[in-house]
């Protein structure tokens, strides 16, 4: 997802950065600011930045430049109670990851994930490998890693 489709010039643009859009539900509507260079940050730093930009959105204190330049977006309906859904890609981004509500199934926790992606830019097999790697990284020790 370091790519984007240039509709006007029919080109594929390779990005040298990975900015993640985070969908934030506010009383003013949905806002999708970006966490810049997310691939080079520790999980603890991402968590702090997520809280900061979410608060800025809710208080209308965020600079509008924070809404541009995303590589992909992460959206969650878990807090509202949604499980599986099909998130819609925010052009010119090429993918969006939807996170549902954690549910308990047979004494195990399950986190529903839905990945939508632009097949013109992202190969379906690569998307499946991404989902498998994400699943592996969210394995048993994930909650422990977050608490460090």
Protein language model regions, located:
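C-terminal catalytic/motor cores of large multi-domain enzyme assemblies
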Residues: 3-148
């Amino acid at each position: 997802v370091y790519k984007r489709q240039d509709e006007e010039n029919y080109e594929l643009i390779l990005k040298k950065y990975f900015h993640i859009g985070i969908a934030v539900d506010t009383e003013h509507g949905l806002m999708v600011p970006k966490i810049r260079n997310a691939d080079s940050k520790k999980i603890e730093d991402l968590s702090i930045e997520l809280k900061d930009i979410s608060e800025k959105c809710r208080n209308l204190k965020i600079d509008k430049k924070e809404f541009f330049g995303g590589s992909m977006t992460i959206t969650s309906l878990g807090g509202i109670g949604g499980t599986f859904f099909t998130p819609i890609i925010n052009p010119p981004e090429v993918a969006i990851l939807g996170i549902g509500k954690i549910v308990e199934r047979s004494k195990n926790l399950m986190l529903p994930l839905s990945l939508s992606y632009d097949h013109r830019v992202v190969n379906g097999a690569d998307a499946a490998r991404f989902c498998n790697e994400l699943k592996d990284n969210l394995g048993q020790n994930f909650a422990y890693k977050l608490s460090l």
